[in-house]
């Protein structure tokens, strides 16, 4: 509490207000909780994975948590700072549909080449299925990661080149909102 570094400076609050959908009081509340859980101001992959394990106790969220961690860690320093955490949280919980889709696209585009390949999507969908474990019963046509990926590509890959551009991803998500709901695991009730 008496440490200067543990308190947000007014200019940091102003910057976060400008780059997120949170109010000043919300930013300060989130910061208080973040500093409580991460006294050094850095959220590690291990800590991030533990958070996911609390929400998905019946599956193995480690692979998916790693993918999400990599998107939260904007500067790729191996840690999530409070600013990185709050900006990602802002998009995923309060962002527009298009902002959420851009964020999701970055999550699925594992090699950051501007396309989502079948293999990348299979990696993500497999991680999601492992994370939810047996807690979700899926219809026969989507009960394996491979079937799910095939269905998504059938709907989204308009030019049939086995990779999705952001435009294809965006249009496909608008045509079939259930695809993005199943993929993002974002709380759409907070949009």
From Swiss-Prot:
Annotated Pfam families: EF-hand_1, EF-hand_7
Main location: other
A GO molecular-function annotation: calcium sensitive guanylate cyclase activator activity
Domain EF-hand per the UniProt entry, residue ranges: 24-59, 60-95, 96-131, 144-179
Entries under PROSITE patterns matching the protein: EF_HAND_1, EF_HAND_2
Extra remark: Binds 3 calcium ions via the second, third and fourth EF-hand.
Name of the protein in its database record: Neuronal calcium sensor 1
Species for this entry: Lymnaea stagnalis
């Amino acid at each position: 509490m008496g440490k200067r570094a543990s308190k947000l400076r007014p200019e940091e609050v102003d910057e976060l207000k400008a780059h997120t959908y949170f109010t000043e009081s919300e930013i300060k509340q989130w910061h208080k909780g973040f500093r409580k859980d991460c006294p050094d101001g850095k959220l590690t992959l291990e800590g991030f994975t533990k958070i996911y394990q609390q929400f998905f106790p019946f599956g193995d969220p480690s692979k998916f948590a790693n993918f999400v961690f990599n998107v939260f860690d904007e500067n790729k320093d191996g840690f999530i700072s409070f600013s990185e955490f709050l900006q990602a949280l802002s998009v995923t919980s309060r962002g527009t549909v298009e902002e959420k889709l851009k964020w999701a696209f970055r999550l699925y585009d594992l090699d950051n080449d501007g396309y989502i390949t079948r293999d990348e999507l299979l990696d993500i969908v497999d991680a999601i299925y492992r994370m939810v474990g047996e807690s979700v019963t899926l219809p026969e046509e989507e009960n394996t990661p491979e079937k799910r990926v095939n269905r998504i590509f059938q709907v989204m890959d308009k030019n049939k080149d086995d990779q999705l551009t952001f435009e294809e991803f965006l249009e496909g998500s608008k045509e079939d909102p259930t695809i993005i709901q199943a993929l993002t695991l974002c709380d759409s009730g907070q949009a």
